[in-house]
Amino acid sequence: MISITEWQKIGVGITGFGIFFILFGTLLYFDSVLLAFGNLLFLTGLSLIIGLRKTFWFFFQRHKLKGTSFLLGGVVIVLLRWPLLGMFLETYGFFSLFKGFFPVAFGFLGNVCNIPFLGALFRRLQGTSSMV
């Protein structure tokens, strides 16, 4: 079994709060304070979960620099109180950074989900490009 440290548990909680504040800020018509707070919590929680060195390594790989620049640029734009533009940049950066993870996640959801329609939908979204 995988052992999880106390710092990783705290990181999961902080990341969850970050996602909550980002979604809540989006629901409140792109409230810049909530979005900025959510961004900071999300990035802090991510670094607590996987560690500072691995976080730096993930974001600054040569083939991920474009996505990283859009994501971090979006965070800066949100902090400068331009939330709509910042969230568009962040969304593009997020999909650019995590595009290799989506087929794996959809494949997992397709296997776990017992509802026939949703299982077939997730398996179709998985496609043929798998990281395994």
Swiss-Prot record:
Listed GO biological process terms: endoplasmic reticulum to Golgi vesicle-mediated transport; protein transport; retrograde transport, endosome to Golgi
UniProt key word Transit peptide: no
Listed transmembrane segments: 10-30, 32-52, 69-89, 101-121
Membrane topology classification: Multi-pass membrane protein
Tagged with keyword Transport: yes
Keywords: Golgi apparatus, Membrane, Protein transport, Transmembrane, Transmembrane helix, Transport
UniProt-annotated location(s): Golgi apparatus membrane
GO cellular component: cytosol; endoplasmic reticulum; Golgi cis cisterna; Golgi membrane; membrane; nuclear envelope; trans-Golgi network
Topological domains annotated Lumenal: 31, 90-100
Cytoplasmic side: 1-9, 53-68, 122-132
InterPro entries: Got1, Vesicle_transpt_Got1/SFT2
PANTHER family: CGI-141-RELATED/LIPASE CONTAINING PROTEIN, VESICLE TRANSPORT PROTEIN GOT1A
Recorded family membership: Belongs to the GOT1 family.
Role description: May be involved in fusion of ER-derived transport vesicles with the Golgi complex.
Protein name as annotated: Vesicle transport protein GOT1A
Organism for this UniProt entry: Homo sapiens (Human)
Phylogenetic classification of the source organism: Eukaryota, Metazoa, Chordata, Craniata, Vertebrata
